[in-house]
């Protein structure tokens, strides 16, 4: 065993006093002890601070790594959601074209109930996917998007039957983005019924019982030809069988030298010659009385031909009494106090006799000229 060295404190004299190093006695000793104790406490505090800073740095580094992990997970989920939605749209198109869609896998983590929400930051692409349903705080699940498409299908089942403002023919093919559900897929040659025209150039129309938007630059407006108004044929009361010109008519009666005179004074058709009188011929400086007589007789013959044609076309039978004229003829004849006048006593009968005499005279004159 180790032996303890004996202390020499007992060897000192009891009456011997301790030596003072200063005038303050043992004060310096207590001061040195207090200083050493305070130094020790400072060192301990510094150690605690360093340990705390190390722990904080460890916790901060662990928190930063956790934030990176969360961001990586959110980015991965965004990509998965986008791929899933594109796949759903492609399968929907296949169903519309009659092909069978591929079933979803049971292991797909994106298929869930309507209550599942993913607290991720919304991106611009996802905003366009759900057309305003996603917010900055979160994005709805794919099941919500499919329910929205189902509602669109219900709207498509009831086609638009309202008024249209025109039709347009497509001259350029256009296939909208799969995210754009409001635009029409158009092909060259399609006929679109226009519902609304906006000044921005995006029109609304219906194609194959589907209402949607399309740009006016892809179509040509069809101008509907207005139905031509039906021509109302007015029955002419005066119609002749032989359609001749004044020149031919005057050549037939050997008076072609008066063609220019008559044309310059407004006698352009044969109808104008029917009402000509001898005073009119004198005003036209036709001085030869024989020429005037021949022209008047020819005009009267035209009038007689027209009256015979009208009589043939009349469907109203005459009365049993041949002496009494029809009502239409009586309107043209002068009458006194409403009394009917027979054809024997009328002025028309006298004019007919005079016309016959004039025609005989014209024939005699023509015979004499030919004999000469």
Swiss-Prot record:
Q: Which gene encodes it?
A: Samsn1
For this UniProt entry, the molecular function terms from Gene Ontology, in alphabetical order, are: phosphotyrosine residue binding
The record's note on quaternary structure and interaction partners says: Interacts with FASLG. Interacts with phosphotyrosine containing proteins. Interacts (via SH3 domain) with CTTN. Interacts (phosphorylated at Ser-23) with YWHAB, YWHAE, YWHAG, YWHAH, YWHAZ and SFN. Interacts directly with SAP30 and HDAC1. Identified in a complex with SAP30 and HDAC1.
Q: What is this protein called?
A: SAM domain-containing protein SAMSN-1
Gene disruption: observed consequences: No visible phenotype. Mice have normal bone marrow B-cell development and normal splenic T- and B-cell populations, but show an enhanced immune response upon immunization. Mice have constitutively activated Lyn, due to constitutive Lyn tyrosine phosphorylation.
- Species source reads Mus musculus (Mouse)
**Induction, per UniProt:** Up-regulated in peripheral blood B-cells by IL4 and bacterial lipopolysaccharide (LPS).
Q: Where is the composition biased (Low complexity)?
A: 52-63, 129-146
Lineage at the top is: Eukaryota, Metazoa, Chordata, Craniata, Vertebrata
Motif Important for interaction with 14-3-3 proteins in this chain: 20-25
Which tissues does it occur in?
A: Detected in spleen and lymph node (at protein level).
- Localization, UniProt: Nucleus; Cytoplasm; Cell projection, Ruffle
- The SH3 domain covers 163-224
Q: Which GO terms describe its cellular component?
A: cytoplasm; cytosol; nucleus; ruffle
